[in-house]
C-alpha cells in the first residue's frame, strides 16, 4: 500500500513486532491511539518485549504526561528514556540506529521517523496494526 501525505510518499507493508529483536517506542504517539495508555506498558511487560520507551520531554507542556509515563515504566520495570532536546520519534530513531541498527525497529505513528531512519526499520502503528514504512520520496 502507498501513502502520500504532507511529509512525502511512503510504502507501507504489513509487519509484526515479533520480527524485531528490540523496539524503540515513541510513547506519546502510540499511547495517544489507545483507549487506555497504561495498556501499552502493561502488555509490553506481560509479553516480555525487549523495548525502550522514548518519552517526549522537550517542552514544558509535555511534563505532566511524561511524569505519568515514567511512573508506568517504573511500575512495570520497563526501560524508558526522556527525549529532552527533540521530538521522541526522532530520538527513538537515533537511539535505534546507534544502539541496535538492523534487526530493530522504531514504533510510532509519525512519518518523520521514516525520513530520519538510516539503519533501523520504522513501524507505523495505524488502526491497531503495524506497517513497515519505506520513504519513496528519498532520492527523488
Model-predicted segments: where are they?
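Metal-dependent nucleic-acid phosphoesterase active-site entry motif
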Residues: 1-34
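Nuclease catalytic cores that cleave nucleic-acid phosphodiester bonds
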Residues: 20-23, 30-32, 38-43, 49-140
